[in-house]
Amino acid sequence: MEKEVIAYLDNETIIDSQSVKNTNLKEIYFDNSKESLEVIRHSCAHLMAQAIKSLYPEAKFFVGPVIEDGFYYDFRVESKIGEEDLVKIEKKMKELAEAKIEISKYEITKSEALAKFQNDDLKQEVLLRIPDRAVSIYKQGEFEDLCRGPHVPNTKFLRFFKLTRVAGAYLGGDEKREMLTRIYGTAFADKESLKEYLTIIEEAKKRDHRKLGTELKLFTFDDEIGGGLPIWLSNGARLRSKLEHMLYKIHRLRGYEPVRGPELLKADAWKISGHYANYKENMYFTQIDEQEYGIKPMNCVGHIKIYQSDVRSYRDLPLKFFEYGVVHRHEKSGVLHGLFRVREFTQDDAHIFCMPSQIKEQVLEILAFVDNLMKLFDFSYEMEISTKPEKAIGDDEIWEIATKALKEALDEQGLKYGIDEGGGAFYGPKIDIKITDALKRKWQCGTIQVDFNLPSRFKLEYTDSDNEKKQPVMLHRAILGSFERFIGILTEHCAGEFPFFIAPTAVGIVPIGEAHIAYAKEIQKELLELNIDSEVYEKNESLSKKIRIAEKQKLPMILVLGDDEVAKRSVALRDRRAKEQKNLSLDEFIKLVKEKMSEVHF
């Protein structure tokens, strides 16, 4: 069957099929392409709003955008809407889709729109955010709403959708304002794609790091402590410590010097850096001796001061500083989400001070670091370069050198990458590292950011080979992004089945009876000498219960010890990752775990 056209593409702008006069534009067909899904999902948000309005006539609507994997709509109703109401709303949506209602667009002036929606305070809110120009309105049957579009031409295209959850959302994201109802949903062009997506969603629920974090006793949150402030339990702290120690060694082998900056800096430093003017609302401030101080949201200023603590020559460059820097950022309570979005987190942060001619060499080193680390955890990844925006500092030549260095480094490594033209920060181009997990979800983690701005603001300099003062380039670099976020992603990626070398408890030791506990503790001590954590299950419980408890903790290996094992100094091994059981001498087992630990190569 021939595909139907639902919209057109004008450069990067998607236009409704009913608005197009120039038929030379690229056609967008009804399929699962990125552009098509944007149109389908945008339209489906309106279909949902129309259904809600039909079921709850008093409903008033705020905004309903497309997001990465679907859409949502924020609205106000007198009734409390819960998960159980989604089925009823979906049923009404299907009726409207099957009615094949035409969708049309018309434009009015902003003043006309203000008059039209004078009795709708949420629409007034939306209009206040729109510039003084023509306002577009989309109409389908009795329902119409402000929207810039684009939309499909008829509701018949909106058949494969699912409403996924209900949440609360502050009006305009401002937690001081009223809480609206938000319903999330998704839509596709065919039934199979929707089914596949819903299967992934169900699997994601099982892997939710907040759920697993509780079950595996990794971390917790407490209202008396505050939102977005994770508390690491012993299992989580062990996992995190293993990751930190592993990365520390790798950093040293790659020529990075450990440093540490203060967590509290005078506001004057943040004024020089530009954070005070441009990032203040995301920072926490306090007064000490009648002077304002800011808790650091980033580690760069501390590292700059370390650079400035000595006279620098071109022979010293590149200088590579790294720190597990604890930072604090003011996040609105509505966006906090487990370990993914917190107010306190630790970055695996590094700053490299180098000459422009050294940028490519340094980026190559970072890319090799990224590749080794992602392979270790079985992540695939992709890169994206963001180039010079319209408003930028630094001369064109430096920008060209830096951008070329990033591209050449990626090309030399044979890495595919996208380009976000004009998407760079005003102070330099960057590479974003996006990893793909076991559920094919993409996560923004690491960044390689070239910075001409801070070296200029703080007047950094080095003496070149001609004995002249020059300004170094600064590279901001984080590979994990933050330990919190990465551990959250890793937990979901491996469903809590952590690799042996990083598992908080790598071995569960199950003595059958009291007579076998001493041997179990001997093995535990020997493992600890190898930096391998284990747990002895010595409670007076049945063997099957002890094994079941160990399995629920998703331990990589379980040892069962009885009379035979004690007498022969052996172990009955259950390797949960290899899915095998076997008997080994204690020496053979120790050799095996040493091999497991040596699998970490950099």
UniProtKB/Swiss-Prot annotation:
GO terms for cellular component: cytosol. It comes from the Bacteria. One of its GO terms (molecular function) is tRNA binding. Its main location: cytoplasm. It is found in: Cytoplasm. PANTHER family: THREONINE--TRNA LIGASE, CHLOROPLASTIC_MITOCHONDRIAL 2 (PTHR11451:SF44), THREONINE-TRNA LIGASE (PTHR11451). NCBIfam families: thrS. HAMAP family: Thr_tRNA_synth (MF_00184). This is Threonine--tRNA ligase.
